[in-house]
Amino acid sequence: MAGIKALVGLSFSGAIGLTFLMLGCALEYYGVYWPMFVLIFYFICPIPHFIARRVSDDSDAASSACRELAYFFTTGIVVSAFGFPIILARVEAIKWGACGLVLAGNAVIFLTILGFFLVFGRGDDFSWEQW
């Protein structure tokens, strides 16, 4: 039952993050949909982790080079997702208020993704591998 509560909490926080992103795009004052491109970063963020889990040997207690490379790529993706709306605001493609809403949405979404892997990445009976 604890896994279901965690899943509901994660889906709620994901909905809040996407609401911030949509508000940054769809409010009449902002009205520009360029920040929606951060959705690409949301989708590619867990891919290095998935590849590292499949390739690396879990018998090592220490961190492997493959896992460290996956952390590096994931960090680059997350930093790019935070930098993209700032660059759009600097070149005046979007307003700074929209940038703030998108950055708030980024923080909530990436914390949700991190929470997902912390809750369901343990490898117990109720894990993310079932989904």
UniProtKB/Swiss-Prot annotation:
Signal peptide: none annotated. It is found in: Golgi apparatus membrane; Endosome membrane. It comes from the Eukaryota. It holds the Pfam family Vps55. GO terms for cellular component: endosome membrane; Golgi membrane. Belongs to the OB-RGRP/VPS55 family. It is a multi-pass membrane protein. Widely expressed, including in liver, duodenum, kidney, pancreas, lung, spleen and brain. The chain crosses the membrane at residues 7-27, 32-52, 69-89, 100-120. Disulfide bonds: none annotated. The keyword Transmembrane helix applies. GO terms for biological process: late endosome to vacuole transport via multivesicular body sorting pathway; negative regulation of growth hormone receptor signaling pathway. This is Leptin receptor gene-related protein. Its main location: Golgi. Keywords: Endosome, Golgi apparatus, Membrane, Transmembrane, Transmembrane helix. Coiled coil: none annotated. The gene is LEPROT. The keyword Protease does not apply. Involved in protein trafficking. May be involved in the down-regulation of membrane protein levels.
